Each structure stands twice: as C-alpha cells, then as structure tokens.
Amino acid sequence: MSYSISQIAKALGAEAAGNLDLTVTGAAEPGDAGHDQLALAMSPKYAEALAKGGARAAILWPGAAWQAMGLEAAIFAARPRLAMAGLTAMLDPGQGVASGIHPSAVIDPSAEIGADVSIGPLTVVGARARIGAGSVIGPHCVIGMDAVLGEGAWLREMVSIGARATIGARFIAQPGARIGGDGFSFVTPEVSGAENARKTMGDQGEAKAQAWTRIHSLGAVEIGDDVEVGANCTVDNGTIRNTCIGDGSKLDNLVHVGHNTRIGRDCLLCGQTGVSGSVEIGNNVVLGGQTGVVDNIYIGDGVIAGGGSKILSNVPAGRVIMGYPAVKMDLHTEIYKAQRRLPRLLRDISALKKAVSKPGPSE
C-alpha cells in the first residue's frame, strides 16, 4: 500500500508543498522514519529528530520551513491529532480476517447474515440473530439469540454479544469485550449491614449475617451508532430496562458499565473506569482512567473527571472534577496544597504550644 503526498493531503484536507508525486508506504516517528516513510513531525520539538532519520517527506505544522529541514515534500496539519486520525485510517492494514464465512463457524439457520459479512473460525451465531451488511466478525466470537448488530460492525477475536442486545452501525469491539452479561444484582432476606452502613455513613446496626439472593436480568443492552469498546470491556444487562450507550461514545480497555446505566452521546470513558448500576450520564462526558462512579447518581452534560476520581454524588453539567470524593478541580488543588503544608503547620503549632506553656522569668 502506497500513497502520494498529493493523495494524503487531499484525504486530510490539508495543504502540501514540494514534490507532491512522491510516494510513501507508511508513517513513522521522525528519528525512525525511512526513505519511503512519512515522518510525523507535527511540532518543532519533534522536527529536531528529522536529521536522525531518512524521511523525504513529513507532516509538519503550518508555516514550517520544510526545505530547511532537507525534505522533498511536506504536508501542513493545522490540527495534528485530527490529521493522525485520517492518516492512520488510510494506512491501517487490518487484522487479516478472511472474507466469507469460515467452515468451522456455527450459525443458527434462523440467523440473518447481511451481504459481504465475514465470520471467522469457531464463531457462534445464535437463533434469530441479525448481522448487518459489511460486518467483520473475528474468530471465537459469540453473538447471542435475538441480538442485532448493525452494518459495518468490526468484532475482534473472542468478543461476546449477549442475547437480545441491540447494537447500531459501525460498532467496534476489541478482543475480549463482553456485552450483555448479567447485572451484579443481589439482595438479602432482611436489611443488610451494607445497607445500614450506607444509610448511616458507617453504622451496620444489628444486621445479621445473611446469604445473597440473585436478582435476574430481564433487560438487555442497547448501543447506538459509531460506538467503540476496548479490550475486556464489560457492559451488563439491565435488570428491567435496558442498559444504554449513546451514539459515538468510546469505552477504553477494562471499562465496566453496570446494569441499568444510561450513557449519552460522544462520551469518553478511559481505562479501568467503573460505573455502578442505574447511573445517568449525559452527553460529551469524559471520565479519566480509574474513575469510579457510585450507583444511582446523575452526571450532567460536558462533565470532565480527572483520572482516579471517585464520584459519590450528582455532578451538574459542565463541571470539571477530581479527587476522592470528587470535587471541583480547583478546590481539589487547594486541598492538596493544604495537605502538603500540614507537616510544617503541625510543627509550628507544636513550637507555639511549647512557647506559651514555658514559664517566663517573672513566674
């Protein structure tokens, strides 16, 4: 696969200069780029390494003096990471899944398979499942009964889609993703110590030890268009209503979404984030890595949570939060600074106590 500088610039909607017919076969960091690779030197700090590599062409920032860098051609990207999105889409070689349906795949006769669908080895497709046209299903996947998968889906190896799940177009699931497991719902015959402790903020009361009884999941999972889930990501079925993820949302590796939770459009949930059950998350919310969200709360549109935040109460729209418990980021910074001063403050207090308690000459 090779592209000319002209083709790449046109695809990216970017300006280019120099030998626009020069072709490249891949991309690389500036210091590692070979003769036929496009160097990614999108800011001056990266361009310094161009001399260590052999690239003849590079993606640079607007106005860069490309000829002084010894290049034969250059593409100018106003927004580098957006250019990366387009470039990597052009150069992605894929995962090598063969076209057609592998002979070892087990497909129920009542399943509906769209046109140009590829299904890998040892994949199982359940009764009445529907797979949209142009989808690619990798090896060892499971698509449960009555599940619906939209057009252009891309399931990597060992992905499972539970029964009755409904998923929109262009869904992408990385290896080991699990959509539609049962929710983590259990109850005791009488009020438990955990319930008392939560209600009283620490007192278990007289609750006795009891066994847990399972609450079955009658709901399913409903996912919109253009959603992506990372490796080993899990999304649980709803108890009665469906667990929902809106159009364009992206879930990183090891993200967990609990039963009944509803996530809006274009949200970003970073690695190891855990969302408890029955949470309402608005649109365009960003939860940094290892964020924890307690159950039965609301997070408004446009909220951003710093990595490691623990969200224990409702968050109004547009707020930037951080910490455990999560508070406004500027307040968290003030608290952190105050904590850093505590040892010195305690030493000062100790010294003052000694000074005022020491008898004076007149005493």
UniProtKB/Swiss-Prot annotation:
<dbReference type="GO" id="GO:0016020">
    <property type="term" value="C:membrane"/>
</dbReference>
<comment type="pathway">
    <text>Bacterial outer membrane biogenesis; LPS lipid A biosynthesis.</text>
</comment>
<protein>
    <recommendedName>
        <fullName>UDP-3-O-acylglucosamine N-acyltransferase</fullName>
        <ecNumber>2.3.1.191</ecNumber>
    </recommendedName>
</protein>
<comment type="subunit">
    <text>Homotrimer.</text>
</comment>
<comment type="function">
    <text>Catalyzes the N-acylation of UDP-3-O-acylglucosamine using 3-hydroxyacyl-ACP as the acyl donor. Is involved in the biosynthesis of lipid A, a phosphorylated glycolipid that anchors the lipopolysaccharide to the outer membrane of the cell.</text>
</comment>
<feature type="active site" description="Proton acceptor">
    <location>
        <position position="259"/>
    </location>
</feature>
<dbReference type="GO" id="GO:0009245">
    <property type="term" value="P:lipid A biosynthetic process"/>
</dbReference>
<dbReference type="GO" id="GO:0016410">
    <property type="term" value="F:N-acyltransferase activity"/>
</dbReference>
<dbReference type="Pfam" id="PF04613">
    <property type="entry name" value="LpxD"/>
</dbReference>
<keyword id="KW-0677">Repeat</keyword>
<keyword id="KW-0444">Lipid biosynthesis</keyword>
<dbReference type="InterPro" id="IPR020573">
    <property type="entry name" value="UDP_GlcNAc_AcTrfase_non-rep"/>
</dbReference>
<keyword id="KW-0441">Lipid A biosynthesis</keyword>
<keyword id="KW-0808">Transferase</keyword>
<dbReference type="InterPro" id="IPR007691">
    <property type="entry name" value="LpxD"/>
</dbReference>
<keyword id="KW-0443">Lipid metabolism</keyword>
<comment type="similarity">
    <text>Belongs to the transferase hexapeptide repeat family. LpxD subfamily.</text>
</comment>
<dbReference type="InterPro" id="IPR001451">
    <property type="entry name" value="Hexapep"/>
</dbReference>
<dbReference type="InterPro" id="IPR018357">
    <property type="entry name" value="Hexapep_transf_CS"/>
</dbReference>
<dbReference type="InterPro" id="IPR011004">
    <property type="entry name" value="Trimer_LpxA-like_sf"/>
</dbReference>
<keyword id="KW-0012">Acyltransferase</keyword>
<dbReference type="Pfam" id="PF00132">
    <property type="entry name" value="Hexapep"/>
</dbReference>
